[in-house]
């Protein structure tokens, strides 16, 4: 069994983390949370994990949600294609974090993001580019927290993570409650339960009708794991997955599907910020550029992808040339069937003309932690992100990455990881 080594502090000022997720190896190359999965929907995936769980008695779900006003998701209108009434972003008299302090004379604040289209860099075709979002448009958020009440591997902090994150977005970045879909397993409305069907439907709602300079926010706190990679796009041979509350009946959600739903449809200049507080979440959105506080961990070979014709698909899409998309795809799949080694796994590029940024609290070979902080169960990444942002909301990507690392280092052995759909400029501020 492979278990992450968390430091256990005895000081009253520090939490005593418990391992939120543990990894063990099963036949057929499945890695998952040992406390969670005592059986799978499909037979034959190995023996059950140890009995007992975490040792924290968990009361049944309360009869009412947390107490903040939350209409059920089906009332948002987004699922049926009818957008809610346009909200007033920000409260009167309250400056938004996005009213950039650099423009207002604070030279210590990072400058605003560069405008226009930007090249992916060396090896990319000339017309292949992406665009940053200035986050001045519409805001929508999808927040998912699953404690798995009554199931083996029950967690304590995931619903608290969502409550804290939604309040932070609302109070500091002008996200309106009516533009948030919150799926947690303490809610009585079946449409607000984090089932696989509801999660997938909400992912489609999140990105529907997104326009340049819109800001979309996705937050997942719950169990994560790995499964055998079937399409050859993962270096370690495994796809990352998340587990809906009903995964035992209907299965998990794979990173390839999350990328297809939430990343591929986005136009240039649309921001999607994602936070995953789960194990094996480092590449949960299948983004091609991965950074740590030590530097670049992973980046695509654009020259190779361009030579294979992969980048033509997305450049045609970003220019609205759907016929170009079709012809590029046909040419790609034709080459893929010729036996050419370059196409033997039918790989598609994971870059995007949009502005997609993902924060995760662990590398794919680490676990995440479920700890008690200020007498409240919470996930490490969710807590560290909010704590670091509250201390200094005007940070660049690299500053925030280091700030989150410093927060985590006080209580955890985890390291933060930042993944992007495009090469990361360390200069632009993090806008939400």
From Swiss-Prot:
The gene is casA. InterPro entries: Caspase-like_dom_sf (IPR029030), Metacaspase (IPR050452), Pept_C14_caspase (IPR011600). Residues 12-21 have a biased composition (Low complexity). It comes from Sclerotinia sclerotiorum (strain ATCC 18683 / 1980 / Ss-1). Residues 46-74 have a biased composition (Pro residues). The lineage of its organism: Eukaryota, Fungi, Dikarya, Ascomycota, Pezizomycotina. This is Metacaspase-1. Its EC number is 3.4.22.-. PANTHER family: METACASPASE-1, METACASPASE-4. Keywords: Apoptosis, Hydrolase, Protease, Thiol protease, Zymogen. The active site is at 223, 279. One of its GO terms (molecular function) is cysteine-type endopeptidase activity. Residues 1-11 have a biased composition (Basic residues).
């Amino acid at each position: 069994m492979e278990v992450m080594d968390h430091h256990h502090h005895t000081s009253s000022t520090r939490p005593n983390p418990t391992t939120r997720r543990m990894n063990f190896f099963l036949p057929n190359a499945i890695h998952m949370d040992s406390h969670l999965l005592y059986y799978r929907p499909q037979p034959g995936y190995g023996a059950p994990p140890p009995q007992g769980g975490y040792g924290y008695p968990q009361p049944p779900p309360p009869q009412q949600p947390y107490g903040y006003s939350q209409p059920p998701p089906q009332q948002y209108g987004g699922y049926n294609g009818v957008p809610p009434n346009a909200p007033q972003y920000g409260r009167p008299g309250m400056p938004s974090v996005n009213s950039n302090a650099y423009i207002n004379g604070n030279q210590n604040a990072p400058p605003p993001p560069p405008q226009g289209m930007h090249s992916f860099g060396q090896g990319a075709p000339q017309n292949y580019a992406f665009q940053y979002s200035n986050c001045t448009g519409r805001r929508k958020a999808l927040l998912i927290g699953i404690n798995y009440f009554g199931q083996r591997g029950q967690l304590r902090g995931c619903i608290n993570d969502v409550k804290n994150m939604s309040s932070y977005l609302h109070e500091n970045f002008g996200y309106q409650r009516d533009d948030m879909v919150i799926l947690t397993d303490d809610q009585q409305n079946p449409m607000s339960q984090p089932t696989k069907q509801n999660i997938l439907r909400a992912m489609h709602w999140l990105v529907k009708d997104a326009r340049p300079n819109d800001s979309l926010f996705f937050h997942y706190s719950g169990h994560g794991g790995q499964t055998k990679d079937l399409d050859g796009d993962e270096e370690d041979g495994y796809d990352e997955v998340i587990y809906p509350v009903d995964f035992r009946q209907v299965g998990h959600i794979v990173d390839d599907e999350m990328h297809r739903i939430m990343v591929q449809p986005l136009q240039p200049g649309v921001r999607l910020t994602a936070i995953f507080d789960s194990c094996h979440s480092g590449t949960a959105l299948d983004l091609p550029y991965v950074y740590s506080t030590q530097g670049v961990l992973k980046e695509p070979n654009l020259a190779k992808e361009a030579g294979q014709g992969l980048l033509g698909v997305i450049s045609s899409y970003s220019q609205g040339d759907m016929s170009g998309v079709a012809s590029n795809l046909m040419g790609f799949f034709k080459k893929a069937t010729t036996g050419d080694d370059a196409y033997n796994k039918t790989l598609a590029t994971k870059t995007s003309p949009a502005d997609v940024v993902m924060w995760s609290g662990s590398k794919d070979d680490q676990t995440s932690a479920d700890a008690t902080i200020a007498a409240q169960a919470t996930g490490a990444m969710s807590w560290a992100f909010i704590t670091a942002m509250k201390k200094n909301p005007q940070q660049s990507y690299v500053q925030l990455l280091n700030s989150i690392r410093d927060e985590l280092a006080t209580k955890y052995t985890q390291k933060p990881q930042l993944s992007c759909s495009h090469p990361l400029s360390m200069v632009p501020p993090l806008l939400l």
